[in-house]
Amino acid sequence: MTAQDQTDHTRYRRVLLKVSGEALMGRRDYGLDTDTVAAIAQDIADVVAMRVEVCLVIGGGNIFRGISGAAGGMDRAQADYMGMLATVMNALAMQSALEKRGVATRVQSAIPMSAVCEPYIRRRAERHMEKGRVVIFAAGTGNPFFTTDTAAALRAVEMKCDVLLKGTQVDGVYSADPRKVADAERYAELTYHEVLARDLSVMDAAAISIARENDLPIIVFNIHAPGAFASVMRGEGKFTRIVEQR
């Protein structure tokens, strides 16, 4: 199948993938698992080969979570800034893994740190993606009290993405954690209102609200299932879709 054929079989032109920091831990309790990072990078490379424009937001919970630091007595804003720096570390690790697979990648940080990455500039990020480069947005929104889920929704809207994908540890949204509740119900499709009304642990309310106000579909899938990202691009496999109306 040629690259053009692959493009014709995908549903989306430009997408944002949100990956939690915890997803990069693999079976570790802390930090980065290089095999897991490599596997996710390969899945991203496969989607780039389909000529889909890809950007990413990566969390930092595998290294530091601001809200946990605040719970331990640390100033919340200070703790959140530490969490933002953790996302930069994860972004650099993913950039390295992608470039080893021949995927041109740029990291843009909402907190300028010119020695290691570019500052976040919306139009520059768009140009990178138009040229087939992956762009990883680091440091969240650059402001404390906002999660990386909110940053993902914000960047997806700014980049005019067709869909926001959240790669998680399970294959969609459930009524309860399926790893703890055997009979948890899996949803194939939900509305933004249902997610908020049922208090489902998908994304925080701010992220859902941004998506809803801008008619941005959200797809939740298992980031650890090999090839799942590419399958979702073709409308295949198991996932949950969140939209305005079912």
From Swiss-Prot:
GO terms for biological process: 'de novo' CTP biosynthetic process; UDP biosynthetic process. Its EC number is 2.7.4.22. The gene is pyrH. The keyword Cytoplasm applies. Gene3D superfamilies: Acetylglutamate kinase-like. ATP binds at residues 18-21, 61, 65, 168-169, 174, 177. The keyword Cytoplasm applies. UMP binds at residues 60, 80, 141-148. It holds the Pfam family AA_kinase. It catalyses: UMP + ATP = UDP + ADP. This is Uridylate kinase. Keywords: ATP-binding, Cytoplasm, Kinase, Nucleotide-binding, Pyrimidine biosynthesis, Transferase.
